[in-house]
UniProtKB/Swiss-Prot annotation:
Annotated binding of Mg(2+), by residue: E30, Y76, E84
EC nos: 6.3.1.19
Keyword hit for Nucleotide-binding: yes
Pathways per UniProt: Protein degradation; proteasomal Pup-dependent pathway; Protein modification; protein pupylation
Similarity field: Belongs to the Pup ligase/Pup deamidase family. Pup-conjugating enzyme subfamily.
Catalytic reactions on record: ATP + [prokaryotic ubiquitin-like protein]-L-glutamate + [protein]-L-lysine = ADP + phosphate + N(6)-([prokaryotic ubiquitin-like protein]-gamma-L-glutamyl)-[protein]-L-lysine
Active site per UniProt: D78 (proton acceptor)
Additional information: The reaction mechanism probably proceeds via the activation of Pup by phosphorylation of its C-terminal glutamate, which is then subject to nucleophilic attack by the substrate lysine, resulting in an isopeptide bond and the release of phosphate as a good leaving group.
Role description: Catalyzes the covalent attachment of the prokaryotic ubiquitin-like protein modifier Pup to the proteasomal substrate proteins, thereby targeting them for proteasomal degradation. This tagging system is termed pupylation. The ligation reaction involves the side-chain carboxylate of the C-terminal glutamate of Pup and the side-chain amino group of a substrate lysine.
The protein's name: Pup--protein ligase
Species assigned in the record: Corynebacterium urealyticum (strain ATCC 43042 / DSM 7109)
Length: 504
């Protein structure tokens, strides 16, 4: 089997024909950032103005605010003046972590240039990019997870098994949030205080095709960016944006294991919830994990019980799960060595709910790190949880600036754990993932910009514009090589007489 060449699609390593075990999966993250310009505590430019300034070098160079970067990720300005990065196609957990972090670094570089431009124009101030999910006006923006899954799995079956996991997953990977109730808001019937999840109050349905007006936990819009007869794209929009690499690894890694089990037909318990939206909001405010939620069966269960059951199944699954291939030192899929720490941390977090002592994970889980930070400041200064100074600390935790952001300060002090080295992140900023279709897109874009060729690029297509141009479709996201793309790149030296563009 040679899935990297595109001769075969991903790996049915074991299992039956009806229930193959997929240990190689295309996945990606879409992250929207909050943005603001502040000088001496006062806002200077509005979000629209500062976002336009942020993207001005991109527009000047490529004549578009919607481009693919040389690491094959997509950078664009989303609705509501939110800068957004969609990572390139990844096929292993640590690879995705690296490209998620690379996205932070790329948009922060734009913010630093914007600050220089503001200073030269006499406006001044800092440009803050916040990797969070809510603003002071009550708006929410997301961190969307994308997983390529088998078309053979019925959507109804998938949602009934996956929704209980996603609703209760905030226990192990929420980003944490200070919340103050306001009339007409989803939190109006709750007390002010700290909650585990930033997104819980902004979900309105379990599953639907909407994304904003009636925001669901799982979005069903069917855009697989692959062979639609074989695959669908699972689009999860309930997750929080995480600053912690260990929390992100737990969020993605646990989901990978649950999806593998569902696809393989593993026996999982029936925890189908009677009301996912009521459950997700109640769970977000209970740090015991013992809030009883109603099931469709008429019984009740606690989020801790539900997560314990999924965790136990994942432990058993990992013991018998086949290893993916490793070709030329690169994993084609997520190996046990990356998933074993995920399952171990998952269990430790749940143990903390049992004991009520979260100190064993207070450098690894975002909501625990933030809660400790906020409660420490409140205790030292005698502050109520509604104090505006604590709200500022909450926001500054999500500032991605390497020197100024509070999470990064904690990491330098050894109070927040990490997984990746700086070299891995730098490499991900400059190069596309080597094991997926993204490698072709990255090579194509690099060559086009070197030779000054005008191009049009999207997830499944590469095109050289002009009278003598050519186009190649890339339907297989697992194929990292393609002779037609090689020919296109070789032809660029003769065609490069126009300005390069890379429109998404």
């Amino acid at each position: 089997m040679s899935p990297v060449t595109g001769e075969e699609t991903p790996a049915e390593q074991q299992g039956t024909a009806d229930n193959p075990v997929y240990v190689r999966r295309i996945m990606g993250l879409e992250t929207e950032y909050g943005i603001t310009n502040v000088l001496d505590g006062t806002r200077r430019l509005g979000p629209d103005e500062v976002s336009r300034l942020l993207f001005s070098p991109i527009v000047e160079k490529y004549r578009s605010s919607n481009i693919f970067t040389e690491n094959a990720s997509r950078l664009y300005l989303d609705v509501g003046a939110h800068p957004e990065i969609a990572t390139a196609e990844c096929d292993s957990l640590h690879q995705l972590l690296a490209y998620d972090r690379a996205g932070d670094e790329l948009v922060q570089q734009l913010a630093s240039r914007a600050e220089e431009e503001l200073a030269s124009n006499g406006i001044g101030g800092n440009v803050f990019l916040l990797k969070n999910n809510t603003d002071s006006m009550g708006n929410s923006y997301g961190c969307h997870e994308n997983y390529l899954i088998s078309r053979n799995v019925l959507l109804k079956h998938l949602s009934s098994q996956l929704l209980p996991f996603l609703v209760t997953r905030q226990l192990i990977c929420g980003a944490g949030k200070l919340t103050i109730p306001s009339p007409g808001a989803p939190n109006e019937n709750f007390e002010a205080g700290f909650m585990m999840s930033q997104r819980a109050d902004y979900m309105w349905e379990g599953i639907s095709s909407a994304t904003t007006r009636s925001r669901p936990i799982i979005n069903t819009r069917d855009e697989p960016h692959a062979d639609s007869s074989k695959y669908r794209r699972l689009h999860v929009i309930v997750g929080d944006s995480n600053m912690s690499e260990t929390t992100t690894a737990l969020k993605i890694g646990s989901a990978l294991l649950v999806l593998e089990m569902i696809e393989a037909g593993a026996e999982l318990p029936n925890y189908e919830l009677a009301n996912e939206i009521r459950a997700i909001r109640d769970i977000a405010r209970d740090f015991t994990g013992l809030t009883e939620v109603k099931l469709r069966s008429g019984e009740t269960a606690t989020p801790l019980e539900i997560q314990r059951t999924f965790h136990a199944a994942a432990v058993h699954w990992l013991e018998h799960r086949p290893e993916p291939e490793c070709v030329d030192g690169r994993w084609l899929g997520t190996p046990r060595e990356q998933l074993a720490p995920v399952v171990e941390l998952w269990g430790r977090v749940l143990d903390c709910f049992e004991t009520g002592d979260f100190s064993p994970v207070d450098t690894e889980i975002d909501w625990v790190i933030k809660k400790k930070l906020l409660h420490g400041m409140a205790s030292r200064h005698g502050l109520e949880m509604t104090d505006p100074r604590l709200a500022q600390i909450d926001l500054r935790y999500h500032d991605i600036h390497p020197a100024r952001g509070l999470f990064n300060v904690l990491k330098r002090r050894g109070q927040a754990a990490s997984i990746l080295g700086e070299e891995q992140i730098r490499e991900a900023m400059d190069q596309a993932p080597a094991t997926t279709r993204a490698a072709l897109r990255g090579r194509f874009l690099t060559a086009a910009r070197e030779h000054g060729c005008a191009t049009t690029v999207d997830w499944m297509r590469l095109k050289i514009n002009g009278e003598f141009g050519s186009e190649v479709a890339l339907p297989n996201p697992f194929a990292a090589t393609d002779p037609q793309v090689d020919e296109m790149i070789a032809s660029m030296a003769d065609l490069g007489d126009t300005d390069a563009t890379a429109r998404g």
